[in-house]
A protein has these predicted regions:
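Short acidic/histidine-rich active-site segments
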Residues: 5, 109-131, 153
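Charged helix-capping and loop-helix junction motifs
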Residues: 18-29, 47, 96-104, 128-132
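Active-site metal-binding loops of divalent metal-dependent hydrolases
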Residues: 7, 43, 67, 83, ...
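Distinct, well-ordered alpha-helical segments
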Residues: 43-58, 64-65, 71-80, 98-103
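Glycine-enriched alpha-helix->loop->beta-strand junction motifs that scaffold or abut catalytic
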Residues: 27, 34, 55-62, 77-88, ...
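Conserved, mostly hydrophobic/aromatic
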Residues: 6, 32, 66, 78, ...
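Mid-to-C-terminal alpha-helical segments outside catalytic/metal-binding sites
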Residues: 31, 133-169
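Active-site gating/metal-coordination segments in enzymes
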Residues: 1-38, 84, 88-94
Length: 169
C-alpha cells in the first residue's frame, strides 16, 4: 500500500449522507496518520467541510488534492496547509480559467499532473474515454497556465510525484 485514498467528500450528487461522508473521511485521515501514508483527497463541492475536517484531524504531511477543481482561493487554502495539487484534463477545458489560475500559483514542488482516466478527457480528446497516455495534454495545459515549457512541467511534476509516492526509492 502506497497511499490512503482516494477519499474525501463529494456533495455534487448527494448520493451519500453528508454526515456519514464527513465521519468516514475523518477516519480515513486518521488511518493515513496511523500508517504514515500519503492521503489522496477527492473533494467536490465540499471545500469548506474538507478543510474543516483536515484542520480538526491534522493534515498528513503528504496530502494531495487529486483531480483538483478549485480556484486560486482553494489552492491557497490547500497549499497553506502543506498539501499538493494534482491537475487533470479539466485544466484544458475552456470553462476552467480559475483552475488555470490555481495551477499558475502552485509552487514547482507542490503540483502533479494526472488523467483521472477513464474520465475527464482533455481537449482535444474531450468527449472520449480518457487514456493515461493523454497526460501529455494535461502537461501542456499546465505549462500554458504557468507560462513555462512543457518539459519544465514534465520534470517538475515527475520530481514531485516521485518524492510524494516514494518512486525510485
Amino acid at each position: 500500500m502506497v497511499a490512503i485514498g482516494e477519499c474525501g467528500l463529494d456533495y455534487h450528487y448527494d448520493n451519500s449522507p453528508r454526515n456519514i461522508q464527513r465521519e468516514i473521511f475523518a477516519k480515513q485521515i486518521q488511518l493515513a496518520h496511523q500508517r504514515a501514508l500519503p492521503l489522496v483527497i477527492h473533494t467536490r463541492d465540499a471545500w469548506d467541510d474538507t478543510f474543516d475536517i483536515l484542520d480538526l484531524e491534522g493534515i498528513p504531511s503528504k496530502t494531495v488534492f487529486h483531480c483538483f477543481t478549485g480556484g486560486p482561493e482553494e489552492a491557497e487554502a490547500g497549499l497553506q496547509r502543506g498539501a499538493y495539487l494534482s491537475f487533470s484534463g479539466i485544466i484544458t477545458f475552456p470553462s476552467a480559467p480559475e483552475l488555470r489560475e490555481a495551477a499558475a500559483l502552485a509552487p514547482a514542488d507542490r503540483y502533479m499532473v494526472e488523467t483521472d482516466a477513464p474520465y475527464l478527457a482533455p481537449v482535444p480528446k474531450r468527449g472520449k474515454q480518457n487514456h493515461p497516455s493523454w497526460v501529455t495534454f494535461v502537461g501542456e495545459g499546465v505549462a500554458a497556465a504557468r507560462g513555462v515549457e512543457v518539459e519544465t512541467v514534465a520534470a517538475e511534476s515527475w520530481s514531485t510525484a516521485s518524492d510524494f509516492y516514494g518512486l525510485g526509492d
